[in-house]
Amino acid sequence: MRAASYTGILALVGTLSAACGGGGQAPNEQGTTASNGGGGSSASADKNAYPVFPDADSGADPAVPAEQGGRGFTGNGWDTNSNYDLVGEPRATKGGVLRQHILDFPGTLRVLGGPESNTALNFMIKPMVYETLLTLHPTTLQWMPQLATHWQISEDRLTYRFRLDPNARFSDGQPVVAEDVVASWAFMMDKGLQDPSSQLVYSKFDRPVAESKYIVRVKSNQLNWRNFLYFSGDLSVLPSSLLKTVDGARYLKEYNFKLMPGTGPYIVNDTDIVKGQSVTIRRRNDYWGAKQRRNVGLNNFDEIRQVVVRDDNLAFEMFKRGDLDHYFVNVSRQWIEELNFPDVQRGLIQKRKIFNDSPTGTQGLAFNTRKEPWSDIRVRRALAHLLNREMLIQKLFYNEYVPQHTYFGGAYENPGNPKTAYDPKRALELLAEAGWKERDAQGRLVKAGRPLNVELLYYSKTSEPFLTIYQEELRRVGISLNLRLVTGETMFQLVMQRRFDLAAMGWGGLLFPNPETSWHSSLADVNDNNNITGFKDTRVDELLVAYDREFDQAKRLEIIREIDGIVANAHHYILEWDAPFHRIAYWNKFGHPDSYFTRIGDYRDMPSLWWRDQQKEAQLAQARRDSSMTFAVGTTEVRPWGNLGEPGAPVSGTR
């Protein structure tokens, strides 16, 4: 996928794995050997060897009694989870630097919200610096304690209570208290933050109440199965001491390239942000939750450097030179034809195609239906009939992909969605019905003397091969397509400000569909949200209400299918193609679980899940000097999770 924007409720990292990638030795032609596995320290794989709450309540305020969540709190009558499996690999070791690239420097690092904050980099940084009350296990989807040790859900499913971990601390050393949760909710509701999607979500709650220093209560003002999911798993907890002076408006003004203190395992200092060039994310040595079971084997790299490389082809060359540690392969040509050079053949670079249950995103050309003639569905359908997906998949993409017909994917896809095929004749018929049948001297279609011109925004040159073919298809029928290459930052600004005709977009998938923030009519004419096409439909609005109130997963699935059908038949996107795998190439110097990513993860798992393997690193350095050394290349296609089916709902919390 090209562009990537995410409105997610979760950023889950890590996975359970018994061992790390192969422990054998491969003899080279000289008779010497190079180890292709091993690494990491000897550690127990038994989850019971790692406490859920080490040094429980040791940091509690002695003035707070047990019944108010202080030291000696028993948890009677509360829910918790002390039996979850390990997420990370216990043998992982700390240290080292992971060098990654981003195609453009973001317009803001306001990871908490606000205009133009919904970027892939911000989405990655947020859960590394900030934590929520609870988190989901990425394999079982069970709730796990995070900032809260225990929780309660009322019988009517409207009121939630959380007991905070008295040991939790912000990066500035301040303890996490109930007032921090209250202030964090109020901050997200501040209209000065200019974040309508967040306010749509958090307006479903009344103002939380701090019952004590460590117990907070919140009541939903409407029944919604996702409310517990959002409040416990999405709300980043911030220091109330700072929020007393920093409201939404001040945050937008002063925190474009500065982060508030968080409770997470990493920190981004002001000096780590080099505008236009790089962002360095640093591991904290004083992270309060480092010894908890949920973090065993995770958060291993001392530094994660995000370097700006504005050309993806250049990034590929930098990776081959060893200037970047891995490369997420978006281009099939690179995967099939170009990842076969000597360093790959010798095993110095490993390539993997990883199949798992990560949520399917949406990729396509988005129409701005607020503008003519894109408000006419006949014109939108016509342009969709001019994209020859089958030919492109075969000729350009080596049959690596399949045409996409849905906005949700998996079991949520409506099987009756239109399968729009390449059909220039039908395209011309639809254009004629819409009044585009006359032609000017240049052969262009005209209506009322105006030619049919369209500008398409894109930001990755890797898209140009198929876009130029599409441009030629449109020219043949009399449509002028202007391909406008812009930076990722500029494109994001133009799309969020609704200043476009067509835009080449890629959206990450959500574990639990949240159609409201992409398709609700109330967001259609408001900037800075994911309803970029201006979609409005009263039936969809009704279904969104029904979806929120439905606690039966099977019935929710049917609702999403109906929404999917309505949206697909509105043709607000020219949907492109999809793949059920992730392709990655990496230098053979890392330790990682056998699964590589989590069951529902992708390459963004690497910073938290993988680790520096000093033995491999030393052998790789030697092999780069000695061309006779080789390593096992391993299995390219891996299916560590088999076919586990469509993820359902959390085991606890939504009932």
Language-model features and meaning:
Residues 93, 198-247, 254-256, 265-272:
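Surface-exposed binding/hinge segments that line
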Residues 165, 254-255, 287-340, 471, ...:
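Ligand-site clamp/hinge motif
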Residues 119, 124-142, 234-298, 303, ...:
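Gly/Pro-rich hinge or "lid" segments in bacterial periplasmic/extracellular proteins
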Residues 62-86, 95-155, 186, 261:
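N-terminal lobe/hinge region of extracytoplasmic solute-binding protein
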Residues 23-28, 188, 208, 269-280, ...:
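Extracellular/periplasmic solute-recognition and catalytic clefts
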Residues 121, 149-194, 217-219, 309, ...:
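Aromatic- and charge-enriched surface segment that lines or borders ligand/interaction sites
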Residues 99, 177-184, 213-219, 225, ...:
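Alpha-helical secondary-structure segments
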Residues 24-42, 81, 272, 276-279, ...:
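Detector for C-terminal structural segments
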